[in-house]
Design a protein with these regions (language model features):
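Binuclear metal-ion centers of metallo-dependent hydrolases, dominated by the metallo-beta-lactamase
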Residues: 190-278
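Binuclear metal-dependent hydrolase catalytic cores
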Residues: 1-184, 193, 251-278
Length: 278
């Protein structure tokens, strides 16, 4: 659905800079360019026993723009659940946009969220959490909130295992494992107790903000590479890239690492579709 940072790519400030010093943002305005990135999010299309389910991880502030592009393209209509990694705007800023589904497609959407993040939602989306405060007849998202613990749970017959990580000092975020797929979108540190949950991971989708260094809240590519070498997944897709990460140039670098180290790694991109067995 999306593979970019909170502000997305391209940045307005880069496009309006008369010096045009940002090549990635300049490329990102081209139709179909893989440097164009909206808020980090994935959609799991799971063919379980009752039928196919669409499970969304995060609905950030650019979610509706992503849905406009990818839902029609891939024949997606319903949202059967939303799982929240953390309570920043790039993960929950699109909750209000879910009204299009609950008003026109389905009666409600279950939301799975940690208690600490639900407390934030009570402030940022108070009128969705407590619909008694809105005017009668007003159309808002009809959401069913389910509080997650840091232990496995089941959504539409799919087992989901939370992967607790740090997203800045003292700020907890969650990755998730489903089958042998591990998704960690917002991370600055992986606690030791989380590594056993990553054992035998086949596809790792991992945060990699920038090419040169980490920030206080996100892995940069050098640290992300260290983690890949430690976790040893069969394949790695990096996500959460800012405008310093040129899709073609970084992928060329990762291809060279595959030749020298045997590590299968690449930058993901918005709209990437990955068939998996769950």
């Amino acid at each position: 659905m999306g593979t970019g940072t909170s502000e997305g790519i391209p940045r307005v400030s880069c496009l309006t800079n008369p010096l045009k010093t940002c090549p990635v943002c300049s490329k990102a305005v081209e139709p179909g360019n893989k440097n164009r990135r909206l808020n980090t999010s994935i959609l799991i299309r799971y063919a379980g026993a009752p039928g196919s389910s669409n499970i969304l991880i995060d609905a950030g502030k650019f979610f509706y723009h992503s849905a406009l592009q990818w839902f029609p393209a891939f024949g997606i209509r319903t949202i059967d659940a939303v799982i929240i990694t953390h309570s920043h705007a790039d993960a929950i800023g699109g909750l209000d946009d879910l009204r299009d589904w609950t008003n026109n497609v389905q009666p409600s959407i279950p939301i799975y969220v940690a208690q600490r993040d639900f407390e934030v939602m009570k402030k940022t989306h108070y009128y969705i959490v407590d619909t008694s405060v809105i005017s009668p007849g007003a159309a808002v998202s009809e959401l069913q909130f389910n509080i997650m613990q840091e232990e496995p749970f089941v959504v539409h017959d799919l087992k989901i295992t939370p992967l607790p990580v740090w997203h800045g000092r003292g700020y907890r975020s969650l990755g998730f494992r489903f089958g042998n797929i591990c998704y960690i979108s917002d991370v600055s540190e992986i606690p030791e107790e989380t590594y056993p949950l990553l054992k035998d991971c086949e596809i790792l989708i991992l945060d990699a903000l920038r090419p040169d260094r980490s920030s206080s809240t996100h892995f940069g590519l050098p640290r992300a590479l260290e983690e890949v070498r430690k976790i040893q997944p069969k394949r790695t897709l990096f996500t959460g890239m800012m405008h310093l990460m040129d899709h073609e140039k970084v992928n060329d670098y990762l291809m060279k690492l595959k030749e020298t180290e045997g590590l299968d790694m690449q930058l993901s991109y918005d709209g990437l579709r990955v068939p998996v067995m769950l």
